[in-house]
A protein has these predicted regions:
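Hydrophobic packing position at a conserved site in alpha-helical tandem repeat units
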Residues: 68, 106, 110, 150-151, ...
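Bacterial N-terminal signal peptides that target proteins for export
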Residues: 2-12
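Mid-chain, structured segments of secreted extracytoplasmic proteins
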Residues: 68-111
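Charge-biased low-complexity segments
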Residues: 27, 33-54, 58, 74-80, ...
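Structural signature of tandem alpha-helical TPR/SEL1-like repeats
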Residues: 98-101, 139-142, 146, 181-184, ...
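Bacterial N-terminal signal peptides
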Residues: 11-21
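Sec/Tat signal peptide C-region and signal peptidase I cleavage site
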Residues: 22-26
Length: 452
């Protein structure tokens, strides 16, 4: 009897082992199937994302996340990449609320293991960008500064990887209308390049050029010119008769032209650029075309019509040296191009902070005008406006003061008739409380220009 009981117990034990082994084998098979499916979906996701089919990629990324949770559990580090990918897809379709939620989940998983991990930087920057896009600029600043701190802890104070974070912080401070802080995060990059490459490196020239572009973009004309003059000194000291030096001279000319104070200071750098071009052995006539266009536009903006005409005709003369330039030159002169532009307000009333966007509505107006062979506008009139007459007077004044490079056909200036501009703006609904502005102000954005 005892022998029989032992046999039964042994059989039961073998059965349990067999069941456990079978279940374990089945689980392993299921896991392998899920992993294989996950790999297929991951490749599909990458293809969709590369093809910019972001809406479709959301479904794939969601399935990848679900499978990863089944395989590894809800708190596994293996969820970091799937969360980041899904958040990125939502970001690309403009669903910033969902993107922000998922980026936070991704960051929390990483922080649960190491709260200063360099792995945090990428999702933190992405989260900051999502806050920027949704105009939550204070939150964006907080996140970007956290990313910057982690970057410094892991890579040192002057590493190059931080540059993109400073650029993103600049955009946040633009949103907050804090120009001082925006300037800081652009100028700080110059110190990074000086420290990393050495002050005599040509890489520092690239950083100076980037800083000058920032000052130009933000309407800080004098600051831009000071940086450009420093860049010019560096290039001249290298005896560098190069395209880069000519480009710097063009940009210095443009900064003077935007101020509109001294025609001599605006024209002189361009004449130096033409002299440098003449010294080149392998001459790029397209570069000469850009200089001549700048020269003509500069003369036009100061009302020196005859000098402008000569510069524009010199552009057409280039066709005799290289007939392949004809299509490009014809295209550049095919329609009027603004060389001096006046700002029409994008919001009314002027200089009033927006406290509640719901108080504002969308308005528009359409202006019709001609451009004479001198580049001046004529027969300026409002075709339509809604609300009527709210910004009509300031728009008329702005277009009347705008100066164009006229259309040219075969080196002859042409009159352009019936041109139209549609301008959209926002206005506070209780517009009757305010009076219409009487004078436009000079636009603080870069003008349309071949070197812009």
């Amino acid at each position: 009897m005892q022998k029989y009981s032992s046999k039964v117990a042994l059989s039961s034990l073998l059965l349990v082992i067999f069941v456990i082994s079978f279940a374990s084998s089945a689980q392993e098979d299921t896991r392998e199937i899920l992993l294989e499916r996950r790999n297929e979906l991951q490749q599909n996701f990458l293809n969709l994302y590369d093809q910019e089919r972001y809406q479709q990629s959301i479904l794939t990324a969601s399935e990848i996340l679900n499978i990863t949770q089944k395989i590894y559990g809800p708190e596994s580090p293996n969820l970091i990449n799937p969360l980041n990918n899904l958040a990125s897809s939502y970001f690309m379709v403009g669903d910033f609320e969902q993107a922000i939620k998922l980026f936070f989940e991704c960051i929390a998983l990483i922080e649960s293991k190491n709260n200063i991990s360099p792995e945090l930087i990428s999702p933190l920057v992405a989260l900051g960008l999502a806050f920027n896009k949704s105009e939550q600029y204070n939150k964006a600043v907080e996140i970007f500064k956290k990313a910057l701190h982690i970057n410094w802890v892991n890579s040192g104070f002057y590493n190059l990887e931080q540059v993109n974070i400073h650029d993103s912080l600049t955009e946040s401070f633009i949103g907050l209308k804090n120009l001082e802080e925006a300037n800081h995060h652009q100028s700080f990059q110059l110190g990074i390049y000086n420290n990393h490459f050495g002050k005599d490196s040509i890489k520092v020239d690239e950083s100076l050029e980037k800083l000058a572009k920032w000052y130009k973009r933000s309407g800080q004309i004098l600051s831009a010119r000071l940086v450009l003059e420093e860049l010019l000194d560096r290039q001249v000291n290298r005896d560098q008769a190069s395209k880069e030096l000519i480009k710097t001279l063009q940009n210095i000319s443009f900064s003077h032209r935007r101020e509109g104070i001294s025609m001599y200071d605006s024209v002189s750098p361009l004449k130096k650029a033409l002299n440098l071009f003449a010294e080149y052995q392998n001459q790029d006539l397209r570069l000469k075309l850009e200089i001549l266009l700048d020269l003509g536009d500069t003369y036009t903006s100061y009302g020196r019509v005859s000098s402008a005409v000569k510069a524009y005709q010199d552009c057409w003369q280039l066709i005799e040296e290289d007939s392949t330039l004809r299509p490009e030159i014809e295209e550049r002169f095919s329609q009027p191009v603004r060389v001096r532009s006046i700002f029409i307000p994008k919001r009314y009333p002027l200089n009033q902070p927006i406290e509640n966007k719901q108080d504002y509505k969308q308005g528009f107006l359409t202006v019709r005008f001609d451009v004479e062979t001198t580049g001046k506008t004529n027969k300026v009139s409002i075709i339509e406006s809604d609300p009527s007459e709210l910004l009509d007077r300031v728009a008329l004044s702005a277009i009347k003061s705008t100066i164009y490079r006229p259309t040219y056909i075969d080196a002859e200036a042409q009159r352009s008739e019936g041109l139209t501009i549609r301008h959209e703006f926002t206005y506070r609904q209780a517009v009757e409380e305010f009076t219409e502005p009487t004078e436009p102000v000079i636009e603080d954005k870069p003008l349309e220009n071949p070197i812009a």
